[in-house]
């Protein structure tokens, strides 16, 4: 299905009965065509936090939880966010014999839409803790050049030629939803092993996404691909934690080496 057929940006009725068919898959293949040769584009996970989950237990009593969805980056489809919100709303008045039954139903439906195994972990509403970012924040540096659209020529190696392993992060990631034009805000983590990158050039590159139209997953994959091609690290991880919209936040992570997969976190802006 094409994104133009999705419910994004359209007025919709919120379902009050279980409707798995509201889930809208979007094929990853088209946005990945130019990166097909790059190692790591399909390695990683998309983590979603769902803050508006509710269903009825066997006695008809409402239950609430926070959910973490784990979607493999190798899945043929991602799931459009508004359709996911509508899907979870459709479960609000549905009875389940147990919490496990609820989890299994959601995993079955999301796996069918994604075309791969999707996992759901539930947290009590007070249990999903806020983490502090680890690594070196590059936000106070002064870039040499600023652009308003992604420009891979901004990426440079440090003149020292030093070999390093480092984790950097920036809170300045901003892009736009390609359908609604609404701004998406995020923190991006970059773990890098190889010749030292110029940190100022990395910040300039991240800032260059401010007027870019792209889904969260596509932005992370483009960042990964541009760094991989232009800076040629031995190993690379790119992980973005986006702020919440409509009760959901999306957190894509791509890695060149699966041993570099981080644990999912929730930051203060989420």
UniProtKB/Swiss-Prot annotation:
The keyword Cell membrane does not apply. InterPro entries: GTP-CH-I_C/QueF, NADPH_dep_7-cyano-7-deazaG_red, QueF, QueF_N, QueF_type2. Substrate binds at residues 79-81, 216-217. It comes from the Bacteria. It catalyses: 7-aminomethyl-7-carbaguanine + 2 NADP(+) = 7-cyano-7-deazaguanine + 2 NADPH + 3 H(+). One of its GO terms (cellular component) is cytoplasm. NADPH binds at residues 81-82, 245-246. One of its GO terms (biological process) is queuosine biosynthetic process. Pfam families: QueF, QueF_N. Its EC number is 1.7.1.13. Its main location: cytoplasm. The active site is at 177 (thioimide intermediate), 184 (proton donor). Pathway: tRNA modification; tRNA-queuosine biosynthesis. It is an enzyme of class 1 (oxidoreductase). Keywords: Cytoplasm, NADP, Oxidoreductase, Queuosine biosynthesis. Belongs to the GTP cyclohydrolase I family. QueF type 2 subfamily. HAMAP family: QueF_type2. Homodimer. This is NADPH-dependent 7-cyano-7-deazaguanine reductase. It comes from Acinetobacter baumannii (strain ACICU). The gene is queF.
């Amino acid at each position: 299905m094409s994104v133009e057929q999705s419910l994004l940006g359209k007025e919709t009725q919120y379902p009050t009965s279980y409707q798995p068919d509201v889930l809208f898959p979007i094929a990853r293949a088209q946005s990945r065509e130019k990166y097909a040769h790059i190692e790591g584009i399909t390695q990683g996970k998309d983590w979603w936090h769902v803050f508006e989950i509710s269903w009825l237990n066997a006695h008809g009593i409402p239950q609430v939880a926070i959910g973490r969805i784990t979607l493999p980056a190798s899945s043929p489809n991602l799931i459009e966010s508004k359709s996911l919100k509508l899907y979870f709303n459709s479960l609000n008045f549905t009875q389940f014999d147990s919490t496990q039954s609820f989890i299994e139903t959601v995993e079955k439906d999301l796996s069918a839409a994604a075309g791969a195994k999707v996992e759901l972990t539930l947290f009590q509403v007070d249990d999903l803790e806020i983490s502090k970012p680890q690594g070196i924040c590059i936000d106070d540096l002064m870039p040499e050049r600023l652009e308003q659209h992604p420009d891979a020529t901004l990426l440079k190696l440090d003149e020292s030629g030093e070999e390093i392993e480092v984790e950097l992060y920036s809170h300045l990631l901003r892009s736009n939803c390609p359908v609604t034009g609404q701004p998406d805000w995020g923190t991006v983590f970059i773990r890098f092993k190889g010749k030292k990158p110029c940190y100022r050039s990395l910040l300039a590159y991240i800032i260059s996404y401010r007027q870019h139209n792209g889904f969260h997953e596509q932005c992370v994959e483009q960042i990964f691909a541009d760094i991989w091609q232009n800076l040629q690290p031995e190993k690379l991880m790119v992980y973005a934690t986006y702020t919440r919209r409509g009760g959901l936040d999306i957190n894509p992570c791509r890695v060149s080496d699966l041993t570099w997969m981080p644990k999912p976190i929730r930051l203060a802006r989420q």
